[in-house]
């Protein structure tokens, strides 16, 4: 009986007692205490205790004794219903639920999964995954905090099956023993069909009988595990105020609000959560949700694929023939990492080989495999063409798929099926052939075989009909599809655009024509090219285009003439190549591009992976990608991010960029590793280069020396140097100091987020040097003074460093912008700066003092300093304990601050109240050029970087 306390909690039962019964319970309890001579519990405290307090007092006696006393007293006050319920709960409810789950999950083989592939996945993954999840969700040592674990992986990789396998293991007692009394699985695609619900209702849907013991289930939330699958299927607003969320498990809410309340710990904060989603959705949510761990759902590796091919074919020679085709085709190989798609590809190849077809031709492009698989489901083996009914059924599915893509629906009810021409009598056939699957056994909710199958069906719809012929007004035209796909507006559109282009292949058009029995419109080619043509010359629109998606579309189309025309619409491209397959696609397109002016890319770790088996082929692709620098002679800007180069790869890049005719103006290499090769420093010797950004790329002391040697060369014209987050040391400052004294071109130096500390002194001495040549920005006028910018945010500067900075402000009249946010300057250091700001030689325009630990002790000095510096236009005081509003309303300072504000053009502050806001509104009326930005709460956790990068709401629409 002791498990009653730990499993269900005493408090719920005490709350079931009315006031009179509760008083009787206390009286009997006092008698028990006296009879048993229990010293742990005071009779006086029992008399005064609330229900919650009484539960805690009882537990001091130990769980066994607490239960024994509670059980006896409930019988004495004639609440046998509670004792019976508790006894039933202890023995029955958890076991009843586990048995229900065990039966449901053991026999749950929905048609959407081929049984063989499902069994294979269970056999391959379940034990490893069960152990991993147990480690992630069980507290270590004495730690008791609830867990929130994310499972992320690409769509269709098998996350749902993994979670259901975990549920099955829990129901069998193989994992989480004594950790969770209940584990509930909610799928967002399923749940969002309800529109509104309470948590109690969601739990009841999973219960084996109509009446779930909700109170008992929720009585001890730390024993609950909620598994929430497919977060990408729900619209989330994680910016809602906490007051807009819900903590009542019985209250109906919009399901997105209900699940947000769980995720953000407003509801049942003691419970544990296991969440699954795609990497894209995880990226959007990770900053908003405090998760404890992240697990990546691993796809099929090569060994697993090979084993599965052999099991399916049961003919060693044919299995090897089919798998070799997949292994040689990197796009197919990538697709086969998704278990269900591996089954689909293997099945297609098996059928093609068995009927004596051409499997090589089938494997040329991904679209071909999908259409071959889908059409084969609707054509009986004995027939050559589909029946009229089969044509109508597939056309209805394509209409349904298109509606789902536009409404973010992947679970459909019967009404949606009927609206799109699928009758009730069609459903058994569609379930039987595996095009649809049931998501819940006893409800009329249906899903496609796989999200990518829904996407290819939606693409087929656009080959058959115009959007105005669709029964839903949500469905838009093909041009809108293309732009939304290329701009990644809808994260769940993974292949849609690629399939549309793939279906325009001549062979696919013929295949569609044969299946549906009529010729298709040839106008779609022209429409898509017109879309791409609108990109030409539109820099803002091109900036939004995901280059890899554009490449994938053109690759799938396999039309070189169209490819050349399309690529020459682009003047700038931004892409991320995450694997070998992406390299093949990018190389195919970039080698035909000759109009680029701006290129931005990331190759992550692809060029420096340990697996050398395909490095030679990879470098051929890399050569083709870099040929764009030879073809596009007008590239002015190159941005490389998050990339690890090996020596051959960086050498290829250098050889492509070194031509004298190549006049690169701007080079950005953020978080880039060039290995031990110093080719980078050969690259930046290009005399046309004016902007160099190496932020977040580690620079050794020797590399800093090499960099500065180049900056010292007479032919070097670099004006802006960004080296934030480069792990520079104080010793490096001496080297940069020499640059400041000798460089005739350098105007902007950003050293933010490097631990410079005492090195600031060397920099400041250089800035004060009489031979410092920072004089001219552009030689148009002999009187054009440099607006020199110095960024030292988060550099470990203390009060001592302010003394050196103060000397710079007094001696260097060219210093217009000083950013020293996120340094511990404190009042002492700021007062030194204030003294310098008042100096007649100080011409500062922009001063950033965000989060510098300034207090009210500095406000008077700041007032007078700002008043005397007539050039100051931008002031940032956010994130300090210092209140600007006090400066205004202290005696003698209101007029002074008004004077200052009337001369500023930008003011950033924090902690304003209504009275101060009214003052600012009055200032705004007098100074129309003033932009005021603020934050009610300072973001004290931000570390380093540029204050300009912050996003802050306006104080009001008027301000």
UniProtKB/Swiss-Prot annotation:
Ranges where the Pyrin domain occurs: 1-92
Cellular compartment(s): Cytoplasm
A GO term from the CC aspect: cytoplasm
GO molecular function: ATP binding
InterPro entries in the record: DAPIN, DEATH-like_dom_sf, Leu-rich_rpt, LRR_dom_sf, NACHT_NTPase, NLRP_HD2, NLRP_innate_immun_reg, NOD1/2_WH
Keywords attached to this entry: ATP-binding, Cytoplasm, Inflammatory response, Leucine-rich repeat, Nucleotide-binding, Repeat
Biased composition (Basic and acidic residues): 939-951
Keyword Nucleotide-binding assigned: yes
Pfam families named among the record's database cross-references: LRR_6, NACHT, NLRC4_HD2, NOD2_WH, PYRIN
Tissue specificity statement from the Swiss-Prot or TrEMBL entry: Expressed in the ovaries (at protein level).
Repeat (LRR) residue spans along the chain: 593-616, 632-656, 686-709, 715-738, 743-766, 812-835, 841-864, 869-892
Region feature Disordered, mapped onto this chain: 938-959
Listed GO biological process terms: actin filament organization; establishment of organelle localization; in utero embryonic development; inflammatory response; positive regulation of embryonic development
Annotated binding of ATP, by residue: 153-160
Domain NACHT per the UniProt entry, residue ranges: 147-470
Annotated PROSITE patterns: NACHT
Disruption phenotype: No visible phenotype, however female mice produce fewer offspring. Delay in embryo compaction and blastocyst cavitation. Disorganization of the mitochondria in zygotes around the pronucleus and subcortical region following nuclear envelope breakdown. During oocyte maturation the endoplasmic reticulum and mitochondria are aberrantly distributed in the nucleus and cortical region at the germinal vesicle stage, in the subcortical region after germinal vesicle break down and dispersed throughout the cytoplasm at the M2 stage. Loss of cytoplasmic lattices in oocytes.
Quaternary organization: Associates with the subcortical maternal complex (SCMC) composed of at least NLRP5, KHDC3, OOEP, and TLE6 via interaction with OOEP and TLE6.
Family recorded in the similarity comment: Belongs to the NLRP family.
Summary of the function given for this chain in its UniProt record: Required for cytoplasmic lattice formation, thereby modulates the distribution of organelles during oocyte maturation and zygote development. Required for preimplantation development in female fertility. May be involved in inflammation and recognition of cytosolic pathogen-associated molecular patterns (PAMPs) not intercepted by membrane-bound receptors.
Protein name: NACHT, LRR and PYD domains-containing protein 4F
Species of provenance: Mus musculus (Mouse)
């Amino acid at each position: 009986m002791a498990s009653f306390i730990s499993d269900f909690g005493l408090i719920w039962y005490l709350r079931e007692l009315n006031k009179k019964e509760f008083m009787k319970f206390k009286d009997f309890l006092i008698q028990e205490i006296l009879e048993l001579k229990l010293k742990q519990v005071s009779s006086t405290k029992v008399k005064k205790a609330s229900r919650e307090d009484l539960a805690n007092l009882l537990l001091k006696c130990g769980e066994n004794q607490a239960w024994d006393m509670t059980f006896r007293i409930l019988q004495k006050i004639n609440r046998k219903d509670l004792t019976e319920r508790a006894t039933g709960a202890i023995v029955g409810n958890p076991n009843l639920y586990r048995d229900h789950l065990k039966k449901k999950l053991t026999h749950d083989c929905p048609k959407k999964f081929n049984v063989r592939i499902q069994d294979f996945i269970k056999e391959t993954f379940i034990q490893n995954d069960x152990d991993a999840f147990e480690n992630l969700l069980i507290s270590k040592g004495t730690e008791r905090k609830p867990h929130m674990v994310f499972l992320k992986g690409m769509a269709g990789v098998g996350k749902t099956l993994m979670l259901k396998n975990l549920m099955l293991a829990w129901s069998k007692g193989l994992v989480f023993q004594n950790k969770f009394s209940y584990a509930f699985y909610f799928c967002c695609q399923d749940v969002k069909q309800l529109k509104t619900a309470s948590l109690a209702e969601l739990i009841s849907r999973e219960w084996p009988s109509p009446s779930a013991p909700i109170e008992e289930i929720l009585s001890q939330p730390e024993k609950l595990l909620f598994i929430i699958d497919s977060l990408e299927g729900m619209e989330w607003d994680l910016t809602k105020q906490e007051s807009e969320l819900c903590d009542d498990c019985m209250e109906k809410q919009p399901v997105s609000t209900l699940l947000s309340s769980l995720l953000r710990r407003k509801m049942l904060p003691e419970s544990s959560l296991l969440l699954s989603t795609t990497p894209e959705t995880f990226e959007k949510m990770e900053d908003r949700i405090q998760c404890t761990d992240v697990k990546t759902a691993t796809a099929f590796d090569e060994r697993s694929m090979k084993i599965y091919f052999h099991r399916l074919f049961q003919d060693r020679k044919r299995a090897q023939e089919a798998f070799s085709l997949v292994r040689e085709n990197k796009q197919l190989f990538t697709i086969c990492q998704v278990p269900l798609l591996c089954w689909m590809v293997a099945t297609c190849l098996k059928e093609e080989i068995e009927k004596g077809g051409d499997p090589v031709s089938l494997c040329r492009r991904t679209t071909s495999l999908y259409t071959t698989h889908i059409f084969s489901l609707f054509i009986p083996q004995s027939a050559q063409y589909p029946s009229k009914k089969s044509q109508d059924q597939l056309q209805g599915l394509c209409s349904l798929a298109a509606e789902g893509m536009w409404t973010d629906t992947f679970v459909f009810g019967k009404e949606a099926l009927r609206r799109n021409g699928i009758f009730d009598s069609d459903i058994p056939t569609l379930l039987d052939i595996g095009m649809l699957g049931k998501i819940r056994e006893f409800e009329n909710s249906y899903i496609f075989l796989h999200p990518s199958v829904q996407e290819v069906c939606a693409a087929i719809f656009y080959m058959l009909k115009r959007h105005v012929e669709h029964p839903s007004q949500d469905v838009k035209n093909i041009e809108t599809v293309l732009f939304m796909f290329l701009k990644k507006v809808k994260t769940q559109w993974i292949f849609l655009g690629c399939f549309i282009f793939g279906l325009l292949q001549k062979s696919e058009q013929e295949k569609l024509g044969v299946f549906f029995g009529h010729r298709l419109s040839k106008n779609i080619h022209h429409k898509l090219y017109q879309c791409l043509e609108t990109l030409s010359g539109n820099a803002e629109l091109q900036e939004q285009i995901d280059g890899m998606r554009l490449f994938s579309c053109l690759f799938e189309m396999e039309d070189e003439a169209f490819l050349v025309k399309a690529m020459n619409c682009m003047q700038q491209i931004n892409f991320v190549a995450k694997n070998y397959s992406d390299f093949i696609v990018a190389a195919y397109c970039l080698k035909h591009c000759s109009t680029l002016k701006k290129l931005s890319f990331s190759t992550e770790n692809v060029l420096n992976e340990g697996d050398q088996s395909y490095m030679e082929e990879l470098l051929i692709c890399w050569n083709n990608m870099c040929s764009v620098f030879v073809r596009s002679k007008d590239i002015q800007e190159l941005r490389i991010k998050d990339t690890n180069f090996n020596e051959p790869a960086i050498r290829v890049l250098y050889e492509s960029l070194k031509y004298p005719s190549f006049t690169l103006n701007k080079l950005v290499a953020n978080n880039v590793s060039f290995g031990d090769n110093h080719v980078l420093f050969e690259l930046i010797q290009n005399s046309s280069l004016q902007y160099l950004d190496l932020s977040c790329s580690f620079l050794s002391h020797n590399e800093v020396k090499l960099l500065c040697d180049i900056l010292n060369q007479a032919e070097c014209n670099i004006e802006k140097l960004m080296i934030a987050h480069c792990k520079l040391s104080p010793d490096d400052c001496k080297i940069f100091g020499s640059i400041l004294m000798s460089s005739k071109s350098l105007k902007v130096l950003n050293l933010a987020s490097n631990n410079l500390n005492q090195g600031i002194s060397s920099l400041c001495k250089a800035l004060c040097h009489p031979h410092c040549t920072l004089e001219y920005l552009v030689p148009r006028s002999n009187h054009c003074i440099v607006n020199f910018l110095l960024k030292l945010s988060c550099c470990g500067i203390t009060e001592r460093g302010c003394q050196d900075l103060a000397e710079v402000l007094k001696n260097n009249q060219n210093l217009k912008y000083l950013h020293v946010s996120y340094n511990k300057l404190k009042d002492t250091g700021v007062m030194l700066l204030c003294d310098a700001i008042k100096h007649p030689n100080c011409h500062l325009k922009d001063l950033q003092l965000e989060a510098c630990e300034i207090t009210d002790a500095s406000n008077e000095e700041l007032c007078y300093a700002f008043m005397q510096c007539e050039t100051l236009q931008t002031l940032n005081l956010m994130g300090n304990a210092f209140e600007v509003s006090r400066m205004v309303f202290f005696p003698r300072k209101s007029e002074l601050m008004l004077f200052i504000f009337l001369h500023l053009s930008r003011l950033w502050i924090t902690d304003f109240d209504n009275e101060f806001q009214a003052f600012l509104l009055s200032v705004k009326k007098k100074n129309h050029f003033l932009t005021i930005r603020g934050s009610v709460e300072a973001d004290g956790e931000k570390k380093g970087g540029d204050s300009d990068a912050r996003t802050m709401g306006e104080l009001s629409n008027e301000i």
